[in-house]
């Protein structure tokens, strides 16, 4: 679908002539390798588009947090090492001892304004059915919308041959997916439970989408599930490959300059 991106510093009159059009983007962290030796360097891509292709890079000023959880501590990544060349952002991590590392990137809020038609299409295509149904119920399908959005993405990397409990580290992002089990202790065909968090609290009945790619590059068909009363969603890891789990939590906002705020979360990992 199509979005109109609006810099907040512009006046209303200027907005009418300078609105830029861009595509909606999912966001994922995708290391060059998910299974990594100790004491090695790993290049990490931030995909801003789909799980297989980035369409736009993210500039440094949009970053709120870039960090990696190691077996000993959480280490901030110097944004001077952040590269935003072309359509893909990249950075590098340097592994030390064995364990399950957590990589995280959190972006600052941005704003969009959409026509009613574009907003409804966005809700339908990007997996936000509850807001679409609320607009239908309340007779608001014909209303345009202003939205504040921010995205918070993680990747799990297995360093060496000893999985650790660090996979469950909560980074404190506004939206976050936290595995209940370590994916690197599971095999293809297993199920994985994940907790959906918004502002640190479990989200009931959150719409969650998951999928991925096999080692050959074939798509793993996306599936959707709902979180339970404890905010936990259960996923069927049907095949070996690189997997993603994602959700978009959108809520109506009152007494603000926007109508809605959305908080995006994703996590990626590999299953063998």
Walk through the language-model features, giving the residues of each.
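Glycine-centered loop-to-beta-strand initiation motif
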Residues: 85-89, 223-241
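Short, ordered, surface-exposed loop/turn motifs in non-cytosolic proteins
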Residues: 59-61, 201-212
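Beta-strand-rich domain onsets/edges
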Residues: 25-42, 130-192, 197-203, 215-218, ...
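Short amphipathic beta-strand segments in non-cytosolic proteins
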Residues: 65, 69-74, 207-224
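Short acidic/polar inter-strand loop motif in beta-rich domains
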Residues: 108-116, 251-257
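N-terminal, post-signal-peptide region of Sec/Tat-exported proteins
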Residues: 47-83
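N-terminal signal peptide c-region/cleavage motif recognized by signal peptidases
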Residues: 18-19
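Bacterial N-terminal signal peptides that target proteins for export
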Residues: 1-10
């Amino acid at each position: 679908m199509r979005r109109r991106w609006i810099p907040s510093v512009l006046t209303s009159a200027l907005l009418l002539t300078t609105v830029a059009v861009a595509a909606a983007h999912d966001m994922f962290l995708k290391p060059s390798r998910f299974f990594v030796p100790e004491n090695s360097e790993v290049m990490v891509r931030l995909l801003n588009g789909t799980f297989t292709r980035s369409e736009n890079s993210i500039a440094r000023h949009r970053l709120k947090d870039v960090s990696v959880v190691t077996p000993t501590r959480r280490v901030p990544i110097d944004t001077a090492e952040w590269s935003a060349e072309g359509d893909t952002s990249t950075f590098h991590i340097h592994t030390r001892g064995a364990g399950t590392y957590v990589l995280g990137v959190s972006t600052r809020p941005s704003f969009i304004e959409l026509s009613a038609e574009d907003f409804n299409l966005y809700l339908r295509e990007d997996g936000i059915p509850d807001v679409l149904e609320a607009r239908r119920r309340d007779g608001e399908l014909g209303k345009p919308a202003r939205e504040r959005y921010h995205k918070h993405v993680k990747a799990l990397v297995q360093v060496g041959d000893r999985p650790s409990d660090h996979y469950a580290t909560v980074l404190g992002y506004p939206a976050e997916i936290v595995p209940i089990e370590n994916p690197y202790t599971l095999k293809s065909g297993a199920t994985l439970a994940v907790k959906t968090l918004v502002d640190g609290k479990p989200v009931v009945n959150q719409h969650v989408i998951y999928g991925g790619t096999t080692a050959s590059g074939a798509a793993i068909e996306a599936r959707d599930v709902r979180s339970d009363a404890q905010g936990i969603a259960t996923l069927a890891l049907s095949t070996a490959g690189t997997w993603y789990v994602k959700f978009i939590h959108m809520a109506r906002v009152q007494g603000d300059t926007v109508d809605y705020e959305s908080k995006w979360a994703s996590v990626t990992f590999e299953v063998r």
